[in-house]
Amino acid sequence: DCELVDIRLEQEIKTEEIHQALAQAKPHGISILEVTPVDERLPALQTVVEASEFSVTFLDPADDLDARCLTMLTAEKLPRLWRSKPYDLRPLILDLRLLPDDDQGHRRILVTLSAHEGATGRPEEIIAALGYSPESTRVHRERLIFKLTVPAAG
């Protein structure tokens, strides 16, 4: 999975030292992939995320997944409810494609969803809109897509 952490330090520390300290303090199963300094005048990193890409593995049979994905992609609207408020899921789907089955023969998709404030697509909504139970899937966020390239500080 892919997470982003935006940390403000009171004193300047070399990125290698920060990486090493985080690597020693992290819980088992979490990897620190990158430490990059950014100009503190820039917006918080979470506010410049444009989209998130998720892989979804269907643990139960999903023989008609191809047809359901095509129906979803060709739909003009996909009305849904979130916290009792109606919204259209379709414009939040930036990309949806089939992936090769995994080693156990489970069907998989890759979906890229909008991550704008007030317009964030959620993988469990895609799964439910396809007619499957979110509880019968494994979802992994593969990457974050940013609105802009954040220049390194310095």
Spans of features found by a protein language model:
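Core RNA-modification/binding signature centered on pseudouridine synthases
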Residues: 74-154
